[in-house]
Amino acid sequence: MTDVTTLPDRRLLLVHAHPDDEAIGTGATMAHYAATGGHVTLVTCTLGEEGEVHVPELAQLAAAGADQLGGYRIGELAAACRSLGVTDHRFLGGAGRYRDSGMMGLATNEHPRAFWRADLDEAAAHLVELMREVRPQVMVTYDDNGFYGHPDHIQAHRVAMRAYELAAVEGFAPAKVYWTAMPQSVLEAGMVHFAGSSDNPFAGIEEAVELPFCTPDDRIAARIDATGQHAAKEAAMRAHATQIPDNSWLYSIAANFGSEFMGVEYYTLAVGAKGPGAGPYGWEDDLFAGLPVAAGPDRTRAGVTGPW
């Protein structure tokens, strides 16, 4: 167990569903805080057993074959964490406790170990124990739709928010909780840029608001500019070779937008008070904005209504 008194003053916890989610969605943020002296703890909820395999010689590892992909992805995730400078990684409940549920509506949702079926309080208890150990001031996870509707992402959100509630009762919940997001203006700029191109990732989309992760700019709370870490993020993504092929549209976008795409990440604020910001919407440039060195007592929800 980690002795919290030996950890850096700024402690960030991220809760993700599968290996590779951390790199794609929050890799620059993680690398930024790791490089600037923060303690970054990554929790991954499943091994990603139901993922596709984009490395031909490893195709038989897939769930329909040898069903060994999850074990292989442990190594990919370890390599990604090294690229990001993250040394504290945990699997929720231990590696293999929860299984990748697959996409919504598939029979894999009903697997006995599917994360989608996990008892909420039991799963949250694993996260509460980690919070008690590390005492993060800031937690990052997904919104209630799991960013794009994958059952494991939705469940990661539910587990993280339930863990927050349970930890709050004991007095050590994070002071701020953020959800990953993508501003509408950024998506609209991307749609304009790729219109008519052969590798258009927005093909078939008429308006940005059709995308499940589109967030109005005025709802964004933080813009983390970690462009200096764009190479670390890309290296972490490339570590997940079974999931992200070299010809992925993600790298195509990166080739066009460079460090802006790889190094800038956005968040909405679900819990806590928004700190000082800039620009027309007062976007924070630091997830710890407004917090003292140690976690403060303000754990009120910010503009979030209804159940998590």
Swiss-Prot record:
Keyword terms, alphabetized: Hydrolase, Metal-binding, Zinc
Heme keyword on record: no
Reaction equation(s) it catalyzes: 1D-myo-inositol 2-acetamido-2-deoxy-alpha-D-glucopyranoside + H2O = 1D-myo-inositol 2-amino-2-deoxy-alpha-D-glucopyranoside + acetate
Domain of life: Bacteria
Cofactor(s) it depends on: Zn(2+)
EC number: 3.5.1.103
A GO biological process held by the record: mycothiol biosynthetic process
Binding site for Zn(2+): H18, D21, H153
Pfam families the record matches: PIG-L
GO MF terms held by the record: N-acetylglucosaminylinositol deacetylase activity; zinc ion binding
InterPro entries: GlcNAc_PI_deacetylase-related, LmbE-like_dom_sf, Mycothiol_biosynthesis_MshB
Signal peptide residue numbers: none
Note on cofactor: Binds 1 zinc ion per subunit.
PANTHER family assigned to the protein according to its UniProt record, in alphabetical order: 1D-MYO-INOSITOL 2-ACETAMIDO-2-DEOXY-ALPHA-D-GLUCOPYRANOSIDE DEACETYLASE, N-ACETYLGLUCOSAMINYL-PHOSPHATIDYLINOSITOL DE-N-ACETYLASE-RELATED
Function description: Catalyzes the deacetylation of 1D-myo-inositol 2-acetamido-2-deoxy-alpha-D-glucopyranoside (GlcNAc-Ins) in the mycothiol biosynthesis pathway.
Family stated for the protein in its record: Belongs to the MshB deacetylase family.
NCBIfam families: mycothiol_MshB
Name of the protein in its database record: 1D-myo-inositol 2-acetamido-2-deoxy-alpha-D-glucopyranoside deacetylase
Organism: Salinispora arenicola (strain CNS-205)
Classification lineage: Bacteria, Bacillati, Actinomycetota, Actinomycetes, Micromonosporales
Gene this chain is encoded by: mshB
